[in-house]
Amino acid sequence: MTDCTQQKTIQLSFPVTYWTDYFTAMLLLPYGRYRACRYFRQPFVQDFPFLSSVLRLSCKYFICIPRRQCLERLQSYFPTTLAEWDRRERMSLAPDGHYDPRHEIPSPIHVINLARELNVGSILPAAFYDLARYGTSKTAGGTEPLPRLVLEVPSSEDSPASASTSTSTSTSTSTFAPTFVPSSWTASSSEATCGASRFTSPMLVQDTTPVRLSHDDLVLTFRGRETMQRSVSAFLSSQVKDRPPSAGCTVPGAGQACRDAFYFITLNTLRAVGGIAAGRDGDPLFTLGQMIDMLHHTEWVDGQYLRGLPMCGKCRDEFIPAVHAGRQAIWDQIPAWFALEPYDILKARDDELNERDMYP
């Protein structure tokens, strides 16, 4: 099946195939082939260790159905269209309005590394954009590694994996173990204390070494972040700061009240650039969306009263489409900001691979 295998004969003359892949990864492949639709109903952050293992093996051994299912799952959270991105962002909001994407979506560092490894280009623009919204120190520091499935307890009791399995075996299994692991595989406390020579039940262990981007991808992320921030200031200068009133403006005094409203939008955008106040640092798409939300706010103080922005309906009707066009322009430029090909080329290449029985 692969040039990485070799045939040997043991004492009983049975052929034995030696695989270079981890047995735990091979264990997941049948579930990805026949039961992926069921297990992909879990939150993506819980599915990702399973998905990445199945995707690697399905690409390596030319198994088209699980490969297509895994890619579709990835593309649903790292899309190529602005409408799908907005849907993803709405899904990341907690019931109280708190933005917590990592509760539903794995770190983009894992996604970028996986996409680079398997040459899946269509998910890279959204993943780079997702990562570039965070501070530089947080990006450079990396993220925690994914839990990994093991079948044998390490011999070193002071190793991170051993400490994780020996002190909290039952907790780790119940918290992180995917539902496709049969209940009969649950590890007992006596098995968890056995030596390295004895196999135990499959369990997920957590390493401690952070996972980081490659140097080239880290540089691309920082450069893209700077360009993202400049896009906000460019939009403010061209579409908001000195925006004239509409030709049909109904406000007396040459539309001075509408000019003041645009000034207030500019000022409040600069006060919370990139959504810092909302915990969304460096997000120009969110920042421009907030400009539309400001039109409906009623907390503007006029003396002792709270009012909405003093903007007439005509100016409002012209400003909202300009903001939508600005958001779409930002989205269309994201691949170029991170030295990637356009969306349609990346998507077409991945779709072409999905339709084939094997990679070229």
Describe every region a protein language model picked out:
Residues 1, 12, 17, 21-51, ...:
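N-terminal BTB/POZ boundary and linker segment
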Residues 1, 77, 134-136:
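Short amphipathic alpha-helical linker/capping segments at the junctions of internal repeats
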Residues 1-3, 62:
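Alpha-helical oligomerization interface recognition
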Residues 4, 33-36, 92-98:
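Short, flexible domain-boundary/linker segments around small modular repeats
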Residues 7-11, 38-44, 52-55, 59, ...:
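Short, recurring structural edge motifs at helix starts
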Residues 19-27, 48-55, 63-69, 74, ...:
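Short, structured motif recognition centered on aromatic/hydrophobic residues
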Residues 73-82:
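Structural preference for solvent-exposed beta-strand-turn elements
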